[in-house]
């Protein structure tokens, strides 16, 4: 699955913001617009036992085209956000099946 950080029209969103992947399928988060973004999984909004520090990308992806890939191995729903833009609504959710 590929997720854009920033919509094609410049909106501060994950695109798509809600999606599903199979357990073990990689998710590539790619900076689309060149604004600094990161991907932080909410420790209260992931399946029990998941260590969010191991799946989050807290360092900023500053440039267009920079990417971060993560593979989730526990089934369930994970919520994530971009720290600098969470207040603008840059949040997302992935369901692992």
From Swiss-Prot:
GO cellular component, one term: chloroplast thylakoid membrane
Role played: Participates in electron transfer between P700 and the cytochrome b6-f complex in photosystem I.
Gene name linked to the record: PETE
Matching InterPro entries: BlueCu_1, BlueCu_1_BS, Copper_blue_Plastocyanin, Cupredoxin, Plastocyanin
Domain Plastocyanin-like: 1-97
Keyword Metal-binding tagged: yes
Keyword hit for Electron transport: yes
One Gene Ontology term of the molecular function aspect: copper ion binding
Signal peptide start and end residues: none
Name of the protein described by the UniProt record: Plastocyanin
Locations listed in the record: Plastid, Chloroplast thylakoid membrane
Annotated SUPFAM superfamilies: Cupredoxins
Recorded superkingdom: Eukaryota
Membrane topology term: Peripheral membrane protein
UniProt family annotation: Belongs to the plastocyanin family.
Disulphide-bonded residues: none
Cofactor(s) for this UniProt protein: Cu(2+)
Binding site for Cu cation: 37, 82, 85, 90
Keywords, alphabetical: Chloroplast, Copper, Electron transport, Membrane, Metal-binding, Plastid, Thylakoid, Transport
